[in-house]
Amino acid sequence: MIIRSPEPEVKILVDRDPVKTSFEEWARPGHFSRTIAKGPDTTTWIWNLHADAHDFDSHTSDLEEISRKVFSAHFGQLSIIFLWLSGMYFHGARFSNYEAWLSDPTHIGPSAQVVWPIVGQEILNGDVGGGFRGIQITSGFFQIWRASGITSELQLYCTAIGALVFAALMLFAGWFHYHKAAPKLAWFQDVESMLNHHLAGLLGLGSLSWAGHQVHVSLPINQFLNAGVDPKEIPLPHEFILNRDLLAQLYPSFAEGATPFFTLNWSKYADFLTFRGGLDPVTGGLWLTDIAHHHLAIAILFLIAGHMYRTNWGIGHGLKDILEAHKGPFTGQGHKGLYEILTTSWHAQLSLNLAMLGSLTIVVAHHMYSMPPYPYLATDYGTQLSLFTHHMWIGGFLIVGAAAHAAIFMVRDYDPTTRYNDLLDRVLRHRDAIISHLNWACIFLGFHSFGLYIHNDTMSALGRPQDMFSDTAIQLQPVFAQWIQNTHALAPGATAPGATASTSLTWGGGDLVAVGGKVALLPIPLGTADFLVHHIHAFTIHVTVLILLKGVLFARSSRLIPDKANLGFRFPCDGPGRGGTCQVSAWDHVFLGLFWMYNAISVVIFHFSWKMQSDVWGSVSDQGVVTHITGGNFAQSSITINGWLRDFLWAQASQVIQSYGSSLSAYGLFFLGAHFVWAFSLMFLFSGRGYWQELIESIVWAHNKLKVAPATQPRALSIIQGRAVGVTHYLLGGIATTWAFFLARIIAVG
């Protein structure tokens, strides 16, 4: 008799054919909800359809089904992203001056859009240099393409087609994993496996393959481009990959192959994996050899991290154990119970991820200018300004989204009966202390930061410059920030003796880097003006946090409405006959938070735009004399409110206001139109629902009189719908106005 060890049971992780594919179902608007599927009685129907189409919680309470819908939707999202990327690459291939730009990136502007001559619109095709007429783009795609080693428009075509194939693949995957093989709930909740795959697969192998691409393709091609070789003469990527001798001519260590790696003689590879610091003086970007080295190191770290968590083999960390082992002196049972929250509430999980990703996006915004990663990015001022602004806005929206989903978690997924005395419960029990302290901090910051400006405006108006807070009178130097700058400027000598420069030129100490007579980067001086505006940043950020955090902590109950949880995430008032309870829902806090997020980000991008034009960007003469775009006026002008209005907003708006009849005229029209969109929002924000319902009823009366009344009854927007339309147009109008103002200005003077 043969004794066999018991066969390990294979877990079945998917359900086959759980939901049948039905085009009839898809074609029926509102098929996900019994009420909406009946069709419209009133115009409110179309709003409810939009509000609930993606609110999977409202379709079903089955967590597995919700998880599958979210998972499937992610593939749809990826499909759209690939489609968009394909379009970008196609524009580069078909409508751009990429090859011309590649041959002379300092004198030719990037353009990938040529306007057709319909009713005179061809005026928008400005001269970007090299005899090409088109719209100047500020997305940074040209710089990324050069860094990846793309040398021809044919390569862009091929990539665009590849992205289309991937878009189709993702669309198929979204259908397949919902209708054909849908994962079980246990699969979605297997966090250790998910961590291993995401860390080792996405981040580890992703970074490794990018490092490999850089070493074998980007570095040699960029080496040739920097030396002024014609792109058409440079060997193609596959020649570098297949022919080691080609690479060995540029990087001698390639001749030795993998021997140094296995004999641990790694320093041999220092010719293409460097640790220099600072910027490449030819391109004004980070050294690409530094970037390749960085991605290799990151890949190793994440490949190790992707083998740390316990899955099939019973070794490694369990996330639940790690969380529950965390106990501070004041936190009682510590993180006990958090694991269950994060594996059963996707809103809680999403909230954390949005907060982290939002913060990371803002970190990216600040690194794109201080450590410009791509060749010729630093001297393309329009792109620099656009990338900073874009990443700041995105980060702001993601962080507000984090608060929104935290509040939805509190209302829909939080179970107070099982959550006694865990960390979240302890936070909720002293929420009054948290919010009142935060409120005090906001009042303090608001009065003091604004007060410093008001003082300066008053002294300036009275003709008493010696009594102002400024670098030339009463100094308020940002000493801590200056200390951090100096520490980082001096750091390489002590901590990285092999590096030739510090991580960023902005820290100070180093010389400036100029490319083609334009400043790429130089040490950024900080003074009283920065100290003042920094405290406005502190103020606006704290108010945003106050509003959002109050919305989360009081989402389920408050002294005013103890049973708020029963009213849901969004409600206009606590019923008729209970005055003073309107606009207190968690949704309303997100609504208000969006306005303060807009304030906060606006001040940041204004600060950045003016500071860079005043103290960094400009031209360099043959003698090495730097002339900044606004001649260093930030330090003395931005210390009064009047200075911001006169020397920044008004002075720099001249380009967009006077753009008519030039290739920048579209920005003038957008500037005007976006102001209108913004003003349109006020109509929704300042007037009540009753006004519109009354107006509608008299219009309906006229229609009935003429016997042209529709079957669907018109209804005024609900209070919440009105506020949603209002905030959307407020933000859209404000952001588009700022975009037009920034770009018309920087394309004209940069």
UniProtKB/Swiss-Prot annotation:
Transmembrane segments: 70-93, 156-179, 195-219, 291-309, 346-369, 385-411, 433-455, 531-549, 589-610, 664-686, 724-744
Chief location bin: plastid
InterPro entries assigned to the protein according to its UniProt record, in alphabetical order: PSI_PsaA (IPR006243), PSI_PsaA/B (IPR001280), PSI_PsaA/B_CS (IPR020586), PSI_PsaA/B_sf (IPR036408)
GO molecular function: 4 iron, 4 sulfur cluster binding; chlorophyll binding; electron transfer activity; magnesium ion binding; oxidoreductase activity
Binding site for [4Fe-4S] cluster: 573, 582
Disulfide bonds: none
Keyword terms, alphabetized: 4Fe-4S, Chlorophyll, Chloroplast, Chromophore, Electron transport, Iron, Iron-sulfur, Magnesium, Membrane, Metal-binding, Oxidoreductase, Photosynthesis, Photosystem I, Plastid, Thylakoid, Transmembrane, Transmembrane helix, Transport
Assigned EC number: 1.97.1.12
Binding site for phylloquinone: 692
Localization: Plastid, Chloroplast thylakoid membrane
Entry similarity comment: Belongs to the PsaA/PsaB family.
Function as written in the Swiss-Prot or TrEMBL entry: PsaA and PsaB bind P700, the primary electron donor of photosystem I (PSI), as well as the electron acceptors A0, A1 and FX. PSI is a plastocyanin-ferredoxin oxidoreductase, converting photonic excitation into a charge separation, which transfers an electron from the donor P700 chlorophyll pair to the spectroscopically characterized acceptors A0, A1, FX, FA and FB in turn. Oxidized P700 is reduced on the lumenal side of the thylakoid membrane by plastocyanin.
NCBIfam families for this protein: psaA
HAMAP family: PSI_PsaA
Protein name, entry field: Photosystem I P700 chlorophyll a apoprotein A1
Upper classification of the organism: Eukaryota, Viridiplantae, Streptophyta, Embryophyta, Tracheophyta
